[in-house]
């Protein structure tokens, strides 16, 4: 796909979007209508930070970890590479060694394992902890996945989360990659300026380089 246009790789946020079991359902409503106010519609948004396309801050899994405003926003803007890792139960150093990743700073993984934003998956391919030092050696500072988590859905240890941030690698989850080709792109996936938050929704977009 060659285009000069930005391509949206975010899950649209609407009242049908899937959320983590037990987490806050997404809701948008007009809480103050133009008829009531006399001039404007005012919307009310209720959601979990980890709904749809979002980033994780270390505070999400570490009480002493950095929060969103502590993160380097430069990481979320710049050249990125998309690669296909479909049909794998887990992804680690072994699976990525065959790819040429020298000079890559941001890496998005297409697993094509779950494409329904309105259904929460029962199982996902996850990242193994040994991926973190491998990515760090390559100079990669951000990893993105097209599933809700880098760890197994029922996992409590969150080894991949911990090891990735230990090695200076930021996490982007629930990107939508089924409609874009492998290759090099410019990425913008900026978090909101949420002072004390453990993560943030993002509008992730890419443009071919």
Swiss-Prot record:
Q: Which residues form the active site?
A: 60
- Annotated positions binding Zn(2+) 1: 50, 54, 56, 173
Cofactor(s) essential for the protein: Zn(2+)
Q: Name one GO molecular function term.
A: zinc ion binding
This entry's Enzyme Commission designation comes to: 3.5.1.9
InterPro entries annotated for this entry?
Answer: KFase/CYL, KFase_sf, Kynurenine_formamidase_bac
Which residues participate in substrate binding? 20
A Pfam family in this protein?
Answer: Cyclase
Single GO BP term: anthranilate metabolic process
List of residues binding Zn(2+) 2: 56, 161, 173
According to its UniProt record, which reaction does this protein catalyse? N-formyl-L-kynurenine + H2O = L-kynurenine + formate + H(+)
Q: What does the note accompanying the cofactor annotation read?
A: Binds 2 zinc ions per subunit.
Which pathway does the UniProt entry assign to this protein? Amino-acid degradation; L-tryptophan degradation via kynurenine pathway; L-kynurenine from L-tryptophan: step 2/2
What keywords are annotated for this sequence in UniProt?
A: Hydrolase, Metal-binding, Tryptophan catabolism, Zinc
| KW Zinc (keyword) present | yes
Q: Which family does it belong to?
A: Belongs to the Cyclase 1 superfamily. KynB family.
Function according to Swiss-Prot or TrEMBL: Catalyzes the hydrolysis of N-formyl-L-kynurenine to L-kynurenine, the second step in the kynurenine pathway of tryptophan degradation.
**Oligomer and partners:** Homodimer.
Question: What is the protein's name according to its record?
Answer: Kynurenine formamidase
């Amino acid at each position: 796909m060659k285009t000069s246009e930005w391509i949206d790789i975010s899950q649209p946020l609407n009242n049908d979007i899937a959320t983590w079991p037990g987490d806050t359902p997404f809701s948008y409503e007009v809480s103050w209508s133009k008829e009531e106010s006399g001039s404007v519609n005012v919307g009310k948004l209720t959601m979990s930070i980890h709904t749809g396309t979002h980033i994780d801050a270390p505070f999400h899994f570490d009480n002493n970890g950095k929060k969103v405003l502590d993160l380097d926003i430069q990481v979320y803007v710049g050249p990125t590479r998309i690669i296909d890792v479909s049909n794998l139960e887990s992804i680690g150093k072994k699976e990525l060694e065959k790819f040429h990743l020298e000079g890559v700073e941001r890496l998005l993984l297409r697993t094509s394992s779950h494409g329904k934003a309105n259904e929460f998956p029962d199982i996902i391919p996850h990242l193994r902890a040994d991926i973190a030092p491998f990515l760090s050696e390559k100079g990669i500072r951000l990893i993105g996945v097209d599933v809700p988590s880098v760890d197994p859905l029922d996992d409590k240890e969150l080894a991949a989360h911990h090891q990735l941030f230990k090695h200076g690698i930021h996490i982007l989850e629930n990107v939508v990659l089924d409609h874009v080709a492998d290759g090099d792109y410019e990425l913008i996936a900026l978090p909101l300026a949420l002072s004390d938050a453990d993560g943030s929704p993002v509008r992730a977009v890419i443009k071919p380089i």
